[in-house]
């Protein structure tokens, strides 16, 4: 098998390919141009979006040429794949802002490998399409019966599929055709939920007289408990630091289940397979810490990863640097007559509402300086402060907040 494909296969990326042997043979002959796409339906990617981007970086490191297609055109419609209902329609200005933000995130991640990557936006060729010409030239090559056989459409037919979304496959296929004609793209990569759209694009190129092209999909990553990875109790694990802090990002990976550590290291780091196996054969908590550090460094930079590591060590083991912990500032005057435990945890951001804070205390999950507080009427005063006028709050097993009173 071709070296680049073997890397992806050994690290657990590959799910399906239109013709893996033929693709391998083609890549053995020399550099291949390939693309992956992402729709800017939000201001930030989350970690679940990153599997194709990690694969792109692997391929670029092996000398192949990548294109990242930002779907400024397709996002005006919305992809029904994996969705149970129609997406909220965003304004064109919102989509343009999101596209710029997502491109910056990917550029930062690619770092020096960006020299092998081009960014394009499909609104450049989709925004002003003539509908009649498009139906004649492109729509005539699609079978509605075949489209409805794909899982993405079958699922949505049960809950309601708009005609708007039904057009998405034609537009994504047209993207592949345009990239093939203009940039000699021969390979499309993406998540396995895109399989139907990718195969349709390959078929369109063949029907339009193009050469052989390929579709390669990657597994949709799940955790050991069967849940889709990339989510936490607070929601998606976004790359944008305004949405998820580097510390919380680090903690998501640090809290990986034992059974997932090696799999996630293979997919979300560039450590060698030999080193990964060696790390995972040792202390599992050290392996989790290494996983968290490596992924955080790749996404947010080494400096932020080191801060997050120090903060985690300060919170969990009493070592490290307290300054790197998540920190909130409250007025010292709140402690003069005592602040209620429920108010304290709510104001510290460890509970989204006072009702949540109350439940936390009642269920035995509220700690101050590692002392459990189970009385919902407890008043917290200055006796809980350390010499620096600080206290450490803990919610449950893994969420900490350093409170500075001034």
Swiss-Prot record:
Its job: Catalyzes the attachment of tyrosine to tRNA(Tyr) in a two-step reaction: tyrosine is first activated by ATP to form Tyr-AMP and then transferred to the acceptor end of tRNA(Tyr).
Domain S4 RNA-binding stretches: 339-405
CDD domains per record: S4, TyrRS_core
Entry EC no(s): 6.1.1.1
Any GO BP: tyrosyl-tRNA aminoacylation
Subcellular localization(s) per the UniProt record: Cytoplasm
MF GO annotations: ATP binding; RNA binding; tyrosine-tRNA ligase activity
Motif ('HIGH' region): 40-49
Pfam families given in the database record: SYY_C-terminal (PF22421), tRNA-synt_1b (PF00579)
Residues involved in L-tyrosine binding: 35, 168, 172
Keyword RNA-binding: yes
Gene behind this protein: tyrS
InterPro entries from the UniProt entry: aa-tRNA-synth_I_CS, aa-tRNA-synth_Ic, Rossmann-like_a/b/a_fold, S4_RNA-bd_sf, SYY-like_C, Tyr-tRNA-ligase, Tyr-tRNA-ligase_bac-type, Tyr-tRNA-ligase_bac_1
Name of the protein this chain belongs to: Tyrosine--tRNA ligase
Binding site for ATP: 231
Reactions it catalyzes: tRNA(Tyr) + L-tyrosine + ATP = L-tyrosyl-tRNA(Tyr) + AMP + diphosphate + H(+)
